[in-house]
A protein has these predicted regions:
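Conserved RNA-binding domains used in RNP assembly and mRNA/RNA metabolism
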Residues: 2-163
Length: 163
C-alpha cells in the first residue's frame, strides 16, 4: 500500500460510515415513546432549540451521571474540539472532525425544522459529565467528559449538577 492509499483509506471509510449514519438519523422520526419522561424530552428539546446550558443529574440503570445539559449542536462542536487535541495522524483527525461537523449539521437542521415538524429528541447530551456508580464509587477522569445517552434509558433526573 502506498502513502497516498494510507491517507485515502480513512476518508473512504468515514465517508461510508457517515453516509450510513446520516441515512439512519434522517429515518428516525423522533416520535414520543411510551416509557420516556415527556417532561425531560421536552426540556431537552428546549435546550436543543435555544442553546441554553443547565446543570442536570441523571439516573441511568443504577449509574448517576451529572453535568451540563447541552444542545446536540454543542455536543458535536465539543467532539470537533476534542479531536483537535487527539494524539493521532492529522488526516485521521481531519476526517473525524469533518464527520462530526456533518453529523452536527444534521442535528442543527433537525432542531431548526423542529418548529414545523414537531419532532422529539431521542438523545440527551452533557458536557463536563461525571459518573457515580451505585456503590458510591466515582468514575475518575482528569476532567468531565462529553456524554451522550438515549432518553429512553433515563430512569430519573433532577436539575442541578453534582460538585
Amino acid at each position: 500500500m502506498t502513502r497516498g492509499e494510507d491517507v485515502e483509506a480513512p476518508k473512504v471509510i468515514f465517508g461510508r460510515l457517515l453516509n450510513d449514519l446520516c441515512t439512519a438519523m434522517t429515518e428516525d422520526k423522533g416520535e414520543p415513546e411510551e416509557n420516556l419522561d415527556g417532561f425531560l424530552q421536552y426540556f431537552v428539546r428546549l435546550v436543543n432549540r435555544s442553546g441554553l446550558e443547565i446543570g442536570i443529574t441523571l439516573n441511568v440503570s443504577g449509574l448517576t451521571i451529572s453535568g451540563q445539559l447541552i444542545s446536540s449542536k454543542s455536543y458535536f462542536e465539543g467532539l470537533i474540539q476534542e479531536m483537535s487535541s487527539a494524539n493521532t495522524d492529522n488526516q485521521v483527525k481531519l476526517a473525524f472532525q469533518e464527520a462530526f461537523r456533518k453529523i452536527g449539521g444534521i442535528y442543527s437542521q433537525m432542531d431548526d425544522e423542529d418548529n414545523e415538524n414537531q419532532t422529539f429528541p431521542t438523545y440527551i447530551h452533557l458536557r463536563n459529565a461525571k459518573m457515580l456508580l451505585a456503590s458510591g464509587q466515582i468514575i475518575r477522569t482528569k476532567r468531565g467528559v462529553l456524554w451522550r445517552g438515549r432518553l429512553s434509558e433515563v430512569d430519573g433526573f433532577c436539575l442541578g449538577a453534582m460538585d
